[in-house]
Amino acid sequence: MEMTKAIVKENPRIEEIKELLEVAESREGLLTIFARCTVYYEGRAKSELGEGDRIIIIKPDGSFLIHQKKKREPVNWQPPGSKVKMEGNSLISIRRNPKETLKVDIIEAYAAVLFMAEDYEELTLTGSEAEMAELIFQNPNVIEEGFKPMFREKPIKHGIVDVLGVDREGNIVVLELKRRRADLHAVSQLKRYVDALKEEHGNKVRGILVAPSLTEGAKKLLEKLGLEFRKLEPPKKGKKKSSKQKTLDFLNDTVRITGASPPEAIQ
């Protein structure tokens, strides 16, 4: 296949998609497929997504994303390090640890694009919510004594958590950050994240809304839902050194101290 910066196939046959996948793997290309498909996931749980038009993105690092026409987050995904193969009309992404499989059965492919992307830059985060997260990582006690932040922008079932960590009792703590006055929407968003993590880890999950202030309606809803609020002003200026994120393996050490039961590892 003659290589150009981008190869576009309209109404590609399965054989052409397979060929593009092979080239993407060998040349570290970014493959995007627009198709009608069904999706099956099997791992720590099971899920099935019926027939529909979706965007399938396969990145050189193994990331595998399936987007619907709405919402920012993928409806299904696999993280970097996953391996992708094609069997018949099915794209299969396999994650080894923990063992998870995402299978996409292509019913009809409308287009496929192989993009030989060159991008060696790293994102420089500016903006007050990013700086709020940095401040929390450098000084966790602004949330509470004993809080340990572990992840920033952590993808979970229903979205992306701004900051995810644990408290001194071993509870998982979800932080939703807002640089301005928080409203009802922010509370509802936090509740969705907390509920999603409770499905996997039980009731040992807390949700904290972090903002300079909040509306009266947001305050009442927080109290009603059993969620919490911490007042925090965004830093005014200045860059700070990046804090390295750890895995949640440390939860096992926390459990030895507190005697709590460890939640399963969060993907």
Swiss-Prot record:
Keywords: Cytoplasm, DNA-binding, Endonuclease, Hydrolase, Nuclease. GO terms for cellular component: cytoplasm. Gene3D superfamilies: 2.70.180.20, 3.40.1350.10. Its EC number is 3.1.-.-. Its main location: cytoplasm. CDD domains: NucS-like. It holds the Pfam family NucS_N. InterPro entries: Endonuclease_NucS, NucS_C, NucS_N, NucS_N_sf, tRNA_endonuc-like_dom_sf. GO terms for molecular function: DNA binding; single-stranded DNA endodeoxyribonuclease activity. It is found in: Cytoplasm. Belongs to the NucS endonuclease family. Cleaves both 3' and 5' ssDNA extremities of branched DNA structures. This is Endonuclease NucS. It comes from Pyrococcus furiosus (strain ATCC 43587 / DSM 3638 / JCM 8422 / Vc1).
